[in-house]
């Protein structure tokens, strides 16, 4: 369960850097299309830097407050590191570097210029593939980003899609990321993070679900976690999903949020648009089984 591992142990660390990484990124003046690889629930992008002849492998991760470069990759490529920083995470302290200035591109698209360098070796091990970095919420801000899970394409749209009210919900942009409101099992509205770095469908913070109704699943990261699993009914805007696989948490993953919406759910709509400019999360009109 890659998303839980990241959120509980790694991205709490990234959160403290978000305020320093909100420099505006200019929106594309015209639509731009980039290839993605949707593999085992995660979205991969090839990134080029002057220091490497081979492309680097980054995860597209709207749930990360800031973009990250793998410290191991940065050292291997001789990229100049910023000052050491001690980053407090849940139950541990990480050592990283900030800022790490990097001229990075995805094809012809210029990517954020400053990164937090952290050791992502645990994530790489869980993915069975080197994770050289993460494109976080700073990549999405002030942009209209369309993710096509079926065609494995990312498009930066010049303008917000027209006539989206029926298949969209309000998207709130916060310092630490993006969130939307959902109803779980017919309950009251709760805020959850929109997290393209989460491979699973839904992670829910609750103390109400009886333990006897749950199974368990291990999440391996900086530490091993046993995550209770259940099925819930989830309503988001005009959409109601009856049986959503859900990981249960007693403590908040992020302050002010009751969980995460991951690729396991978002991909069911085929196409999802994160319109940070207009503050809308737009779903494809056709559900994909």
Task: Label every PLM stretch briefly.
Residues 9-20:
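Bacterial N-terminal signal peptides
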Residues 24-289:
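Pepsin/retropepsin-fold aspartyl endopeptidases
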Residues 3, 22-24:
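Intrinsic disorder/low-complexity signal
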Residues 1-11:
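Bacterial N-terminal signal peptides that target proteins for export
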